UniProtKB/Swiss-Prot annotation:
Keywords: ATP synthesis, Cell inner membrane, Cell membrane, CF(1), Hydrogen ion transport, Ion transport, Membrane, Transport. PROSITE patterns: ATPASE_GAMMA. It comes from Proteus mirabilis (strain HI4320). The keyword Cell inner membrane applies. This is ATP synthase gamma chain. GO terms for molecular function: ATP binding; proton-transporting ATP synthase activity, rotational mechanism.
Amino acid sequence: MAGAKEIRSKIASVQNTQKITKAMEMVAASKMRKTQERMAASRPYAETMRSVIGHLALGNLEYKHPYLEEREVKRVGYLVVSTDRGLCGGLNINLFKKLLADMKEWSDKGVEVDLALVGSKAVSFFASVGGNVVGQVTGMGDDPQLSDLIGPVNIMLQAYDEGRLDKLYVVANKFINTMAQEPKILQVLPLPPGDDEELKEKSWDYLYEPDPKTLLDTLLRRYIESQVYQSVVENLASEQAARMVAMKAATDNGGNLIKELQLVYNKARQASITQELTEIVSGAAAV
């Protein structure tokens, strides 16, 4: 059994770690609330854009935009949204597992895969496992801006415009609630038809001003940017929630470990006192 002094040192070490994890839990909770507000503010715009695009995809368009046309799939692109920091449980690894499974399905069909990465965890992961990375951005912090994402988005859109990509997906965690975050793979190109039954029951015709091409070129690009930005914001909210839960679990585990070490310390202390008393009694008997 370890000595009482050594056990006391371990208890102090765990207590110091527990203070750190408790502070990180509180910081993550504060950041999560702020990110939830940002996510709630941007979600109506993203959902409205998705609804409008759903109408367009099912409508009788005067001008058929390339983003609305299905084509033979020879190469697909994934814009992968991960975190810049760790200590958020299995958030990133669960996302990567889902992505790798989807990539394997395409690879089994002989389809090539390109990757544009957001977040240092995705960059380090694919540097380890391999993959055709065509663009990346890291260090966006807790207040991501759309301008930070323009680089990877432009790379993928240019590849699609030039016919080097036939499908484009955004891969990110969807924020369900504080305790649940779900990895999602969202197809953004070609634009999927709306799955709302109300959309399918109605025929939508449009009058375009100034002209269909100019309007659709602008609108569809705004749509893609909104979906990518919303995915980044939701992934950030998921990160803070997962980190808060992970740090709470670490703090609770630290408390349990301290209790166990305290019991061991008490036993060691009791054994030490018993031994000292035995030595005193033995010495007195010898005299």
